[in-house]
Structures are given as C-alpha cells and as structure tokens.
C-alpha cells in the first residue's frame, strides 16, 4: 500500500529555486516555474517541507551567512506569496578543499539526521527530492524514498549513480510531488 511521506526534504538551488551559481543577493532569487505550487501541495497535505542545501559559497568567501539568510528570507517570501511555505531550512557552509571534510555537506547525512531528530521523524517514512545524486542518496543511507529531478545542473554522472542506486527520477519538482502524493496503485502487467 502506498502512503504519503511524513516529510519532504528539498534541495533548494536547482530544485525549488533557479540555480544561478552562488546566489548571494535576494535580487538573484527566481523560483522555478511550478515549484511554489508543488511546495503548496506538500503544505496542503500537512507534510513538512524542509530545505536541506549545500552553500559552499560561504566557505569560498563569495557570500556571508548574512547574505545567505537574506536570500533564504526572500526565497521564503516568494513562496509565501503563492500560499506555500518552508517549515525549516538546514544548510552546510563548508567546502572540503577550503574548510576540510565535514559530516554535514551532502551527500553526508548530518543535516538530514538533524531534521529527522528536530521533527521526530521516522527516516524510513520521508522523501528526498533534489536535482543532484548527492541530494537524494541519503534515502539509501537513512531509508525513505529518493527522487532525483532534472535540471541544467544534473550531470550524466548524477544520472548514472541514481540509476545504479535505484533512485527514482522525475522531470521536475511538480512531477516528483505528484509521484509522492498520488496514492493510486499502478496496475501490474500480466
């Protein structure tokens, strides 16, 4: 029997918001067409929509934590203008060649584990949606359902790894949300 997830972990750049490569200013924020409606569908189901994002521009000195927070705030206000909201945001400010290895930068799982703890979630009952393999592979490490969507940042290597790991794919966030919230059973072939 299919069931809706208890929470949806969303990558930000390339999944909900257009990836303009190191977004450091609110005026660079653009929602991906259809993304606000997809987040609203998650909200309307009473399911937490939780952003989990790598932000190595902080470690690289391209933008500051304050810049990140200004972008996050504007991003969330754009969603709110469409009746959608994000329940929480988790970010990793590190980059391995600058700050050294960390346990929060995706594909590591610490940010997800923090959200699972903070929201008292069963990791086997959550969904992970992102445009890169590293955004969704936590579904294999922690449990749950991973769906990789396609963006201009999705590489052939991402696709190969997702296929090898048995991670589902979708054309967009809207399509991924349809997959997560469509509870009809798919007929089996004879």
Outline where the language-model segments fall.
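Conserved Lys-Pro-Asp/Glu-containing loop-to-beta segment of HAD-superfamily phosphomonoesterases
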Residues: 103-136
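Acidic, Mg2+-coordinating phosphoryl-transfer loop and its flanking beta/alpha structural elements
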Residues: 128-168
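Non-catalytic pre-domain segments flanking phosphatase-related domains
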Residues: 1-12, 178-190
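A short acidic, helix-capping loop that chelates divalent metal ions and anchors anionic groups
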Residues: 25, 57-62, 95-101, 156-159
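Active-site neighborhood of HAD-like aspartate-dependent phosphohydrolases
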Residues: 1-50
């Amino acid at each position: 029997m299919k069931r809706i997830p208890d929470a949806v972990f969303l990558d930000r750049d390339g999944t909900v918001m257009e990836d303009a490569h190191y977004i450091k200013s609110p005026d660079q924020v653009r929602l991906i067409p259809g993304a606000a409606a997809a987040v609203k569908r998650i909200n309307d189901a009473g399911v937490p929509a939780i952003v989990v994002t790598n932000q190595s521009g902080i470690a690289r000195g391209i933008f500051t934590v304050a810049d990140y927070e200004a972008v996050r705030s504007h991003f969330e206000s754009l969603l709110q203008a469409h009746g959608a909201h994000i329940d929480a945001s988790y970010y990793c400010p590190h980059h391995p060649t600058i700050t050294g290895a960390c346990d929060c930068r995706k594909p590591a799982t610490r940010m997800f584990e923090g959200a699972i703890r903070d929201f008292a979630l069963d990791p086997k009952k959550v969904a992970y949606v992102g445009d890169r393999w590293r955004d969704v592979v936590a579904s294999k490490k922690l449990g749950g359902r991973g769906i990789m969507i396609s963006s201009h940042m999705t590489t052939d290597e991402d696709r190969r790894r997702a296929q090898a790991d048995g991670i589902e794919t979708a054309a967009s966030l809207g399509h991924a949300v349809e997959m997560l919230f469509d509870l009809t059973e798919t007929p089996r072939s004879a």
